[in-house]
Structures are given as C-alpha cells and as structure tokens.
Amino acid sequence: MSKKILFPQIKGLLHGSDYNPDQWLDRPDILEKDIELMKKAKMTSMSVGIFAWAAYEPSEGEFHMDWLKNIMDKLYENGIYTILATPSGARPAWLDEKYPECMRVNADDHRAHHGFRHNHCMSSPKFREKTGIIINKIIDTVGDHPGLVMWHISNEFGGECFCPLCKKKFQDYLADKFDHDINKLNKAWWTSFWSHTYNDFSQIEPPYANGEFSIMGLNLEWKRFTTWNTTDYMKSEIEILKRRTPNIPVTTNFMQLFPGLDYRV
C-alpha cells in the first residue's frame, strides 16, 4: 500500500509555531522582522488566525479579510506555509452582547460573562451560524491560496455547558440511547435508590452543583454527552472545510492529560 504524503510541498518536517500577526497589524516593521526571524530559525510553517475573530469581523457583518491574505502572501514568498485556524476558540464582544445564548451556563446555573476563551455553548444554533459565516469568509479569501497546507479547527476544545439548550439536547441524547424507554434508564442507573426514579426523560437534568449529582450513571452519561456534543460541534466546522476545500487536511490540537473529554472518541 502506497503512503500518502500530506505536505509534498514541504521538504522535511513541519517546523513552526503559533503566529498572531493580527495583534501587530499597525506595526509592519514587526511583521517584517517576524519573517526574518522565522527564516533564521528555518521554520517551514506557521499556525495563523487562532484567536483572530475580532480582527476578521470587528463588528457584526463588517469583514476585514485583506490582512490575512497579505500575511499568507508574505509567508509564502519566503518559503513558509500556513496552517490556518478557524477562530471559534474566542469570540468578539459584539457577539456575546447581542447573542448571550452563545455564552455557557456553569454548573451553578449561572450564565458566564464575556471573556476568557472556550466558554461558548456548542449547542447554540446562533453560535454555529456565526462560526459558519466567518469560516466561509475565510475560505472565500484564502481557500485556494498556494501557501495553505492545513486547517486547524478552533483551539484546545474543552469544558461543558448547563444551559437550557444543552439540557434539552442531553435529554434527547439519553432518549435515543435508551430507546425512548425511561424504565430502561432507571434500571441502568439504579434510580430507585433514594427514590430518584424518573417518569419521563424531560425530568432529567444535568448534574448541577445544587442538583442531582449522586447518581453515578447520570454523571457518567453527562461526561459522555459532553464529549459527544463537542464532537458534534467539531463536525459542523469540519463539514464546511471538507466540502469547500476537500484536498486540504483538517486537524485540531488537544491537551495532554485533560480529563474533561474522551479523546478516544
């Protein structure tokens, strides 16, 4: 069986790092120096755009994409290829202000405020809609760029959301898993202990900090659901990338010894 070479245009190993030129767009002298140092270090690829959503779309529907093409052009002209990220790992403030349902609800049943990163609800249709729009804009701009060698979806997936959307999705997930038979779930989880028997899937809640967390079956299935829902979200990004740029590989980065997700899935 012949082996497929993923990056035939790159001689040797991929050698590079994360690169955030969007933070220095007002300093072309720094950007020029960056490339000089990359060449000195014999770098062959850079991961670009991981947290660049606000640079791409500073306000809703206002897109600034030229800087990305200019950066990729300069990298390519200097023999450096681009691993291009989707920017869903961190959201601009306008998105959270207008669409607060994109922000996660914590285990204490309080919605998070804007800030940090990866605190979005992966069940949110609005979040998926907005990430789809910005991903398509990126593809429109550089999807056929000769320097593009790989897609990098988001960044360091992790965390969980306890919002009403995730609660309903969790209930539907359980109903499908247990053949819509609540008695089968009760038996599997031994809910008769402490009289915690359910009559309907709609009664099941995530393991809130001030709610039901003593049923180990519930805790386990919630962890499984969180991995499943994260994977489902990842597929929504991958589908766009593979449909529009079928010859470009897609990957993401995980975190060593991270207990929040089952990476085997």
For the regions a language model picked out, list residue spans one by one.
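Aromatic-lined substrate-binding rim segments of carbohydrate-active enzymes
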Residues: 31-112, 136-139, 236-244
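Polysaccharide-binding and catalytic clefts of secreted carbohydrate-active enzymes
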Residues: 112-265
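A short alpha-helix capping/helix-coil boundary motif
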Residues: 12-15, 48-52, 118, 215-219
